[in-house]
């Protein structure tokens, strides 16, 4: 047993810190066995945090670990071996930034599935927990149609077979493309792509296996199509309207806004990215905060995801997403709960991960400043990061 003490403790389940706190972790299981305030219980080892701030590790439920944020096209076109090396490096960077759990949303060559097997065999240290997706699903010629990064399907029957094959190969979740995207030259965010019937088949097959479906859906009518198909999360959702927000609340559909992705492309892409791509990102920014603020007020549950790997959107940027979430009306604590509560619930792992409660895994980060008082505190570069009570960085 190891007891960590003399800290300000934000468990992610409430909206406040607990002062002069301690918590004990079973060194073998990695789970929290007890917590309290004042004088800590006896333990084999004790770690004094000297009044620093402890909070849960972050979820990032929208990552592309095989992509390269330092290239205009996301580095697509690399070999499978190169993709695996880059993915491993990117996972290290995610963990170092405080991200302890990720969900992939489309992966070249199904590299994430191979890396997950290595994780389970203990051969991939210093990487966050991962829910795999394998390749994404798009229509022929649509957003995400890539020789090594996507399944092109053009009917419900093709979708059914492709999803079943993906699960056979080891995918743990499914990503479908409901609309065009910022990075695709031949379409627009308002272009509908996969049909309701096609996406519904993906949902049906996934839910049979207690798996979840994420839909890339930036504009309309694609957002509405994805909601009607019953997907579990809308990714991006820049143009979500009032009617859709109410339907999402009724159905329990989550929204992953990936705010930093469009901000980074519009801010840092000038002179590097094509003009059409910059314009798409800038156009979305004009409306995004109004639309998402309304959705939040209506009661849509937001998750934390950044689209990491897209241009200028690095794997160390997750902490910056929380500042952007506060701009749509959240307090810092509510922004963090998009990660600690909502993201864990979306992925179906909230019994074990997310908040720092007794019985759950001790995946946490240690900060010098109070994250509840100042959302910028989580950007700290030299933070301590723990998985299962063991220090990783």
Q: Which sequence ranges carry the predicted segments?
A:
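Histidine-rich, glycine-flanked metal-binding segment
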Residues: 2-3, 9-55
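Metal-associated gating/positioning segment near the N- to mid-region
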Residues: 52-118, 123, 197, 229
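Active-site environment of divalent metal-dependent phosphoester hydrolases
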Residues: 66-69, 105-111, 138-139, 180-184, ...
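Active-site gating loops and adjacent loop-to-helix segments of metal-dependent hydrolytic enzymes
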Residues: 67-83, 92-95, 127, 134, ...
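Divalent metal-dependent hydrolysis catalytic cores, especially in the metallo-beta-lactamase
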Residues: 86-112, 127-136, 171-184, 212, ...
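Mid-domain alpha/beta scaffold segments of enzyme catalytic cores
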Residues: 100, 104-150, 157-162
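Histidine/acidic residue-rich metal-binding segments in metalloenzymes
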Residues: 114, 157-255, 271-272, 279-302, ...
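His/Asp/Glu-enriched, well-ordered alpha-helical/loop segment
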Residues: 208, 273, 285-370
């Amino acid at each position: 047993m190891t007891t960590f003490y003399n800290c300000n403790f934000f468990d992610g389940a409430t909206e406040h810190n607990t002062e002069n706190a301690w918590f004990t972790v079973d060194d073998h299981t990695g789970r929290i066995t007890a917590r309290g305030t004042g004088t800590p219980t006896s333990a084999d080892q004790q770690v004094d945090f000297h009044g620093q701030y402890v909070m849960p590790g972050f979820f990032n439920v929208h990552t592309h670990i095989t992509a390269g944020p330092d290239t205009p096209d996301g580095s697509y076109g690399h070999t499978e071996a190169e993709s695996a090396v880059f993915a491993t490096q990117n996972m290290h960077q995610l963990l170092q930034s405080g991200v302890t759990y990720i969900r992939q949303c489309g992966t070249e060559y199904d590299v994430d599935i191979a890396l997950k097997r290595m994780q389970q065999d203990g051969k991939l240290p210093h990487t966050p927990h991962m829910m795999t997706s394998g390749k994404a699903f798009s229509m022929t010629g649509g957003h995400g149609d890539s020789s090594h990064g996507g399944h092109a399907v053009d009917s419900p029957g093709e979708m059914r077979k492709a999803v079943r094959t993906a699960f056979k190969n080891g995918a743990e979740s499914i990503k479908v493309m409901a609309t065009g995207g910022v990075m695709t030259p031949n379409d627009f965010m308002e272009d509908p792509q996969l049909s309701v019937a096609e996406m519904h088949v993906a949902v049906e097959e996934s839910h049979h296996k207690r798996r979840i479906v994420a839909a890339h859906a930036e504009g309309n009518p694609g957002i509405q199509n994805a909601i009607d198909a019953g997907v579990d999360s809308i990714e991006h959702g820049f143009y979500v309207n009032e009617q859709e927000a109410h339907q999402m609340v009724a159905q329990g559909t989550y929204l992953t806004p990936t705010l930093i992705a469009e901000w980074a492309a519009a801010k840092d892409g000038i002179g590097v990215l094509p003009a059409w791509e910059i314009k798409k990102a800038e156009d979305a920014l004009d409306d995004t905060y109004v639309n998402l603020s309304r959705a939040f007020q209506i009661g849509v549950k937001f998750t934390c995801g950044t689209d990491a790997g897209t241009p200028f959107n690095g794997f160390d940027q997750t902490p910056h997403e929380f500042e952007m979430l506060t701009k749509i009306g959240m307090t810092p604590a509510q922004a963090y709960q998009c990660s600690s509560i909502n993201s864990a619930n979306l992925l179906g792992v909230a019994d074990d991960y997310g908040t720092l409660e007794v019985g759950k895994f001790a995946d946490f980060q240690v900060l010098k400043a109070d994250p509840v008082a100042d959302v910028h505190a989580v950007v700290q570069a030299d933070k301590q990061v723990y998985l299962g009570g063991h220090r990783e960085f």
